[in-house]
Amino acid sequence: MKTLTRIVAGAAVALSMTATAQADVDFSGKTIEWTIPFSETGGSAKWANFFAPLLSENLPGNPTVVVKFMPGAGSTKGANWFQEQQHTDGTVMFGSSGSTQFPYLLGDPRVRYEYSDWVPVMASGTGGVAYLNPEAAKKFNGTTNNMQGMTFIYGNQGATRLDLIPALAWKMLGLNVEHVMGIKGRGDGRKMFESGEATIDYQTSSSFLKGVQPLVDEGKAVPMMTWGALDANGQIVRDPTFPDVPTFKEVCEATFSCSTTGPEFKAWKAFFIAGFPSQKIAFLPAGTPQDVIDAYTKAFAAIRARSDFAEISAKRLGKYPMYVGDEAQSALNGAITVDASAKSFVTGWLQSEFGVSLN
């Protein structure tokens, strides 16, 4: 009986020490820098700027959360920088996107970062919408059968970035698209579209809602298709944020030159799954103490638990899930895993289409 008493007492002391450690995490008077490896005009910027003030409200001590931007090499510059960070006090964060995941998946030689070293504390899904200028949209009727002879111009962040999703989709649909390579973020692609330099574009959901929907309302842009969303069975269905817009799968099925049963679509879907359902992930650096990790996990969980969270996030980011703690780790695992045959197809296609060798 005395032994049992000692065990119970010891456990109580351990729990008390853990609670004390967590209580000691205090960001009062501190500034947390959340680095986004893109320009300030894209979807990742809107995502981080949405969460930053909410995170400030819910972290112990209510620190100032500042979103910083480090564009370059399609996000590889910022990710390589974050890999070298050794801050353990919770004042440095990083936000990745599909354009950070894809070069990692494809073995891009510029990648010097390792996702397994980082600590994911929150992840969220998103969608994507492709759109046309009004003149081209006159020939789009749910298929691209009447658009085969047209030439489009698209601002592309890089062949191995998230832009491979629209690039492969347009190729499968038989569209002749000229790619202007090396823009620093999708917001720059939207600016090209607005100025008339580009005639076709795509944006992630948050950027579309804020930057493109006004163009649609003014008659200056017309939605073409979304990439879709995944249902519980892993099937592509309409994006809940844009339920009236057909998916790429629907457009492909209706277009003579496109097939949803061959290796092209299998590869496209595999990279779509890696790039969108859990696209944006918030990380702390390697070596971050568990009590700091727990403080972030608790803060993001409190944000998600707000009674108005679904409403305010839908308006700014779209209707997509948010993952916290262990859920964020599972989301990361899905984002950095892709079938070997899909990877092989895409690397071969990148070589033939863009002259990019990853071997």
What are the functions of these language-model segments?
Residues 70-78, 180-195, 206-208, 326:
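Short helix-initiation/N-cap motifs at beta->coil->alpha
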Residues 33-51, 72-74, 155-161:
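Extracytoplasmic "Venus flytrap"
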Residues 94-100, 106, 185-186, 202-210, ...:
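Beta->alpha turn/N-cap motifs
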Residues 236, 301-318, 345-346:
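Periplasmic-binding protein-like
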Residues 212-304, 352-359:
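C-terminal lobe and pocket-closing loops
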